[in-house]
C-alpha cells in the first residue's frame, strides 16, 4: 500500500497569509504546507482520499489524480472538506462514494446545496454520501476501514485505521480503547500543531510523541503542522528516528518488506505519443499515411532507434474494409452494386472481418511501439477496448467485452439486444501496430445493413447518438477520447 501525503499543514497552511516569521519565509519546499490530506493507493490500484482540502485541485495536479474510488472524511471543518466541489472533473459522470458521520454528511448537503437539490446544477460532482459510525468497520475497494472515535477539543471526530496504517488528524484526546486498537499499526499519520505550547483542540508535537509511545512506537509521520512548528530541517534533528516530520509530497510505502519513507515521484509515462487529428480524410490517403508511419517505425527498430508513437484520428467517406482473414460472403451485395453506390471495398492487412467506415465515426489508427509501453498484442487490444469503455461511460453507457469477439459491446450477454458500438482490428509487426478501431458516434447505421459486421449476422450495431437519442458534438467526443488515450497509455 502506498500513502501519499498531499498536504501536511493546518487550517491556515504555511506560509500563513500576512505572516513574516522565519518558517513562513523559509525557501525550503518542505516548509511550504497545503492543508492536510492523504491519498492511499492500494495494492490493487484503488485510490482512496482521506479528507478533501481546499487545496485539492493543486494537490491533484501535483499527484496526477484523475480518478478516485472513495473519499473518507474525518469531520466537517472547511480545511477538510473545502475541496469537494473540485471533485467534479473526476466524478461528474459517475458516482463517487463519500464516507463520513451523519452530522458531517448533513453539513456537506448544506454547504453544497446546489449539488444535492432536486435539480442539481449542471456539471457538479456526483457524490454518493455514505454514513459511517465509530467502531463499525466497512469495506472500501479491497480494504477494510475501521473508524475510530477521537476528540477535536469538544468536537467528536473520526480517525481511520486501514490495515496496518492509521490516520489521526485534528486530535486532542483519544480513549484508551482506541489506543489499544491502534497497537497493531505499523504506520501512523498523526497531528502535531506546534512543539510545546498547549492548544485547546489540537495535540502539540510533544503530546503526539507521547501518544505514539502509548501506541507502541510505530513508524510515524507528523501532520497538520502550523508555522509554529520547527523548520523542517531543525525538526529532523530533534525527532526520534521512527518519527518523521511530514511534508507535502512525502510517500510512505508499507508492505511485507517493511516501511519506506521517500519523496513522491509523479508518474512519468514510458513513452509519449504524437496525436494528429486528420479530420475528414479519404480512406486511401489515411491508409497511405499510416503505412508510411508504420514502415518508418519498423525501420527505426531495425536500426536500433526509438520509433515515434503516433495516434491518428480520422473520419472517412463511406467505405468498406475486409481484413486478411475476412470472408467475402459477409459482404451482402456485389461489387457492381457497391460501385453504383460509390462505396469502395479495401482488402487490408489487419485482423478481423468486414466493417464499415464513414461520416460520424471516429476511426483511430495508433502506430505504437508496444515494447515502449511494456505490453503485448493481447494487452494492447484490451487497452484499446478499455479506452472506449472509459469514454462511453462518460455518456452513461456501459461498454463491455464479449467472449470470442473483439471490440466493445452493449448488452453482450442478452440475446437479441447485443449490439456493437466499436470495432477493433489491428496489425502488428516487430511490436509496431497499425490499423485500430472504429467508434460509432453519429454514424449512419444503415450502411451496416450492407454487411454482416465483423462476420456476425445475429448481432446489432449501435452508436453513441443512437443510444442517447441525440446527435453528439463530434469534435468534443474526439477530444474526450484522446484524453482517455493519453491517461490510459500514459499510466503504463
Curated annotation (Swiss-Prot):
Region (Unknown) location: 1-255
Keywords recorded for this protein, A-Z: Acyltransferase, Cytoplasm, Transferase
Binding residues annotated for substrate, in chain numbering: 350-357, 423-425, 436-438
UniProt keyword annotation of Calcium present: no
Domain BPL/LPL catalytic: 305-492
Subcellular location: Cytoplasm
Site (Lowers pKa of active site Cys) residue list: 420
Protein name, entry field: Octanoyltransferase
Source organism (scientific name): Porphyromonas gingivalis (strain ATCC BAA-308 / W83)
Catalytic residue positions: 454
Uppermost EC category: transferase
Listed InterPro entries: aa-tRNA-synth_II/BPL/LPL (IPR045864), BPL_LPL_catalytic (IPR004143), Metallo-B-lactamas (IPR001279), Octanoyltransferase (IPR000544), Octanoyltransferase_CS (IPR020605), RibonucZ/Hydroxyglut_hydro (IPR036866)
Reactions this protein catalyses: octanoyl-[ACP] + L-lysyl-[protein] = N(6)-octanoyl-L-lysyl-[protein] + holo-[ACP] + H(+)
Record carries keyword Transferase: yes
Gene name, Swiss-Prot/TrEMBL: lipB
Family: In the C-terminal section; belongs to the LipB family.
Anything else known: In the reaction, the free carboxyl group of octanoic acid is attached via an amide linkage to the epsilon-amino group of a specific lysine residue of lipoyl domains of lipoate-dependent enzymes.
Amino acid at each position: 500500500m502506498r500513502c501519499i501525503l498531499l498536504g501536511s499543514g493546518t487550517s491556515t497552511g504555511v506560509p500563513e497569509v500576512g505572516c513574516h516569521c522565519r518558517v513562513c519565509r523559509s525557501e525550503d519546499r518542505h516548509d511550504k504546507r497545503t492543508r492536510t490530506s492523504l491519498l492511499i493507493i492500494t495494492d490493487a490500484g484503488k485510490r482512496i482520499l482521506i479528507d478533501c482540502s481546499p487545496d485539492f485541485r493543486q494537490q491533484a495536479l501535483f499527484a496526477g489524480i484523475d480518478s478516485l474510488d472513495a473519499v473518507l472524511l474525518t469531520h466537517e471543518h472547511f480545511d477538510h472538506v473545502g475541496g469537494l466541489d473540485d471533485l467534479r472533473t473526476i466524478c461528474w459522470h459517475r458516482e463517487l462514494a463519500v464516507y463520513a458521520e451523519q452530522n458531517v454528511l448533513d453539513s456537506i448537503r448544506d454547504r453544497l446545496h446546489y449539488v444535492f437539490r432536486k435539480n442539481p446544477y449542471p456539471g457538479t460532482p456526483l457524490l454518493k454520501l455514505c454514513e459511517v459510525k465509530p467502531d463499525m468497520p466497512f469495506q472500501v475497494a479491497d480494504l477494510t476501514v475501521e473508524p475510530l472515535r477521537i476528540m477535536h477539543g469538544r468536537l467528536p471526530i473520526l480517525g481511520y485505521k486501514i490495515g496496518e496504517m492509521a490516520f489521526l488528524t485534528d486530535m486532542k484526546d483519544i480513549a484508551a480503547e482506541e489506543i489499544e486498537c491502534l497497537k497493531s499499526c505499523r504506520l501512523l499519520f498523526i497531528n502535531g500543531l506546534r512543539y510545546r505550547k498547549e492548544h485547546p483542540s489540537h495535540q502539540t508535537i510533544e503530546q503526539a510523541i507521547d501518544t505514539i509511545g502509548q501506541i507502541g512506537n510505530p513508524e510515524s509521520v507528523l501532520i497538520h503542522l502550523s508555522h509554529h512548528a520547527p523548520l523542517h530541517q531543525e525538526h529532523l534533528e530533534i525527532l526520534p528516528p521512527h518519527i518523521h516530520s511530514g511534508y507535502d509530497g512525502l510517500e510512505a510505502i508499507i508492505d511485507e518488506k517493511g516501511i519506506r519513507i521517500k519523496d513522491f515521484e509523479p508518474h512519468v509515462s514510458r513513452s509519449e505519443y504524437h496525436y494528429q487529428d486528420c479530420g475528414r480524410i479519404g480512406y486511401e490517403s489515411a491508409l497511405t499515411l499510416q503505412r508510411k508511419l508504420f514502415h518508418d517505425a519498423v525501420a527505426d527498430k531495425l536500426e536500433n532507434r526509438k520509433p515515434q508513437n503516433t495516434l491518428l484520428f480520422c473520419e472517412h467517406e463511406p467505405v468498406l474494409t475486409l481484413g486478411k482473414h475476412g470472408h467475402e460472403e459477409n459482404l451482402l451485395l456485389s461489387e457492381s452494386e457497391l460501385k453504383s453506390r460509390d462505396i469502395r471495398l479495401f482488402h487490408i492487412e489487419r485482423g478481423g472481418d468486414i466493417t464499415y467506415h464513414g461520416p460520424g465515426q471516429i476511426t483511430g489508427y495508433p502506430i505504437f511501439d508496444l515494447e515502449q509501453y511494456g505490453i503485448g498484442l493481447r494487452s494492447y487490444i484490451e487497452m484499446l477496448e478499455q479506452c472506449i469503455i472509459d469514454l462511453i461511460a462518460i455518456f452513461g453507457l456501459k461498454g463491455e467485452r464479449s467472449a470470442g469477439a473483439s471490440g466493445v459491446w452493449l448488452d453482450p450477454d442478452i440475446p437479441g439486444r447485443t449490439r456493437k458500438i466499436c470495432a477493433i482490428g489491428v496489425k502488428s509487426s516487430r511490436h509496431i501496430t497499425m490499423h485500430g478501431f472504429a467508434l460509432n458516434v453519429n454514424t449512419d447505421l444503415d450502411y451496416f445493413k450492407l454487411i454482416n459486421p465483423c462476420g456476425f449476422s445475429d448481432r446489432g450495431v449501435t452508436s453513441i447518438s443512437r443510444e442517447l437519442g441525440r446527435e453528439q458534438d463530434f469534435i468534443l467526443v474526439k477530444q474526450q477520447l484522446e484524453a482517455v488515450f493519453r491517461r490510459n497509455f500514459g499510466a503504463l
